């Protein structure tokens, strides 16, 4: 097993996740099987109870793990399926060590950071790195390890020490370190002092960088590269220029041009890893597909505007998987994507009384969009604005996709304005004692624990069965006319089964349900160009080269190409089945 560690210095949020994902993707083009581990040095057990406005989105895995958003980057770039154990947190590793101490596993010894915690980290890495993550079912060849935060922070100290020991445990030819640093441009001059200081700190902790990836707003000058190489004690070929590009999907090709993979191939002796001809051909095809995808991205002239109506729009990372899924779909449709960010509460009449400009600006964005997306969320703030957005899309014939909460608000809007129940709502927003039974469109799932928040939702990969007589459905056609699909869930509330008949009698058809036939998973409005809602989160399984089908449908419908896309899907997947 080969290990490539990606660490960061100077500041956090510097792009370690994209660089780690891009490095892994390039290693896959050699035919290697690649896995990833993310280390998050916070005390939380997982990201499940963290505010999206503080930490960005919570990414959900097949096994129901609620993890850091970077695991989504790994899955999207590498086309792999990770588990909750691929995300190591301080809280998780401390809990593991403490539970072992309570069992008496340490035989009465004084349990310390070194060696007990650091050994636990190393053991965890070695165990998880061997878990198969792709459709081959084989053990990976390379593990990318991203160390979150900034080297030198007190929170990451135990992990840095564990990695220092780990490099000797696995051997130099099996361990490489890429350090990501910032090269700011001040008054037109590229400054290297922050990088020099970061590398000095890194070396003082016992970690020697094999490559220094320099993040900069512009391409590095040759003199800057030479200066960093000289003062950081590396060769110029070990300094990688990672300047700003139009799209992060260009980063792998940017690294490829600078011979990063050639260096890692030599440094880690990757030529000794046994590969079949099929492995090499698959890797070569991956590179070709990626190059074609970026070319389509560059050559696209037509713009598609999607209004994202949410409640966490102040921090775009709150909807990272959603925006990435829209990007994947737009590239597939050969369109330039323009996301119109609409804060849901700004669509509500109360905002007009307080700030008319904000109100009118938000409605102008919504009304000018080619398609409307209402993503998931929790709580009551902005709900009426989301309902108004769903109403606008339904009445105006604008393509609409509602995800999780988005499905629920679309159902509430339909019950209010089509069925004629103006008091319809969800028991999440109003106590069930305040709602008449017929007005409870969305209810709390009976099996969910109301007392404990962490890990108590309906989580992870679950089947959705397309219902009889749903062959007309666009969303079913987008999935290739299959009878069932498997998608990831994260919710506590569901459509009330008691209102389904009334909804369906008016054309609001629940075309997909769970295996019991009771829980509603997908709806589609008959007679509308594209008005779809999913209780699951299709954004969690979207890949760069294989977009999520509901998102693909939204962008295609917004671009006027839905019929062509459905035809192409059925042709290609029909040929594969033959």
From Swiss-Prot:
Homodimer. Oligomerizes to a tetramer in the presence of its substrates UTP and ATP. Catalyzes the ATP-dependent amination of UTP to CTP with either L-glutamine or ammonia as the source of nitrogen. Plays an important role in the regulation of phospholipid synthesis. Keywords: ATP-binding, Cytoplasm, Glutamine amidotransferase, Ligase, Nucleotide-binding, Pyrimidine biosynthesis. Residues 305-564 form the Glutamine amidotransferase type-1 domain. GO terms for biological process: 'de novo' CTP biosynthetic process; CTP biosynthetic process; pyrimidine nucleobase biosynthetic process. Optimum pH is 7.5. Its EC number is 6.3.4.2. GO terms for cellular component: cytoophidium; cytoplasm; fungal-type vacuole. Gene3D superfamilies: 3.40.50.880, P-loop containing nucleotide triphosphate hydrolases. Present with 5370 molecules/cell in log phase SD medium. Activated by GTP. Subject to allosteric product inhibition by CTP. Inhibited by p-chloromercuriphenylsulfonic acid, N-ethylmaleimide and cyclopentenylcytosine (CPEC). GO terms for molecular function: ATP binding; CTP synthase activity; identical protein binding. The keyword Aminoacyl-tRNA synthetase does not apply. It catalyses: UTP + L-glutamine + ATP + H2O = CTP + L-glutamate + ADP + phosphate + 2 H(+). Belongs to the CTP synthase family. The active site is at residues 404, 537, 539. Its cofactor is Mg(2+). This is CTP synthase 2. It comes from Saccharomyces cerevisiae (strain ATCC 204508 / S288c). InterPro entries: Class_I_gatase-like, CTP_synthase, CTP_synthase_N, GATASE, GATase1_CTP_Synthase, P-loop_NTPase. It is found in: Cytoplasm. Pathway: Pyrimidine metabolism; CTP biosynthesis via de novo pathway; CTP from UDP: step 2/2. SUPFAM superfamilies: Class I glutamine amidotransferase-like, P-loop containing nucleoside triphosphate hydrolases.
